Amino acid sequence: KPLGFARDWLVISCYIGQRSVSLFRLGKENIDAKTNTIRLTQVKTKASVVIPILPQVKAILDKHNGGFPPLLSSKPKHNYNVYNDSIKEVCKLAKIDELCKGRIRNIGGAMSKVVTKPKYELVTSHVGRRSFASNFYGKLNQQMIMGVTGHRSESSFLKYINKDREIDAEALNSAFLNAM
């Protein structure tokens, strides 16, 4: 069951784009059934956010009697570590194992050199927020995505999702050529 709860939190995070510090504070009181939205104040930025409840999230909320899954640890500070370990296992079981480059933190928080590992070993709680931003980029208005994720500047947002103006210019040029 704990892996199932971790999976549910991971799916929710991919569709609501919040930092884990805000994600794990969500409760039934954040669900507005009348408007089918989740309302919250982000912990880091103090920004108020209203996020539509998409079908994938609704199915999980329904599975948990109209609320969010239980936390993975009774100690809030331990929840992040348990969640990170659990989503690695969830991704391993889901065979998300292609080799990819990534950075891992050394003890003390300093970044280490780039390593090549199976993707599931590099997954952290941050993957949901970044996936939300990357997956909806180009499909939703950029300002809408930034409003949900809490990014205040376009440059920080584009850096966050590994996009830049050159890539956008190439895509625009390609679209123009295909339209002619």
Predicted regions and their residues:
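Short, polar N-cap/turn motifs at the start of nucleic acid-interacting alpha helices
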Residues: 29-37, 121-122, 134, 138-160
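Catalytic core segments in nucleotide and nucleic-acid processing enzymes
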Residues: 16, 27-40, 53
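Basic, Lys/Arg- and aromatic-enriched nucleic-acid-binding interface segment
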Residues: 1-20, 24, 81
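Hydrophobic (often cysteine-bearing) scaffold residues that line and stabilize catalytic clefts
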Residues: 5-6, 79, 83, 125, ...
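Catalytic-site neighborhood detector that most strongly recognizes the C-terminal catalytic loop/helix
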Residues: 42-46, 142, 149-174
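C-terminal secondary-structure termini that scaffold catalytic or DNA-interacting sites
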Residues: 96-98, 174-180
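C-terminal catalytic core of Y-nucleophile DNA break-rejoin enzymes
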Residues: 43-110, 122
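Short, basic (Lys/Arg/His-rich) helix/loop patches that form interaction surfaces
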Residues: 2-3, 88-147
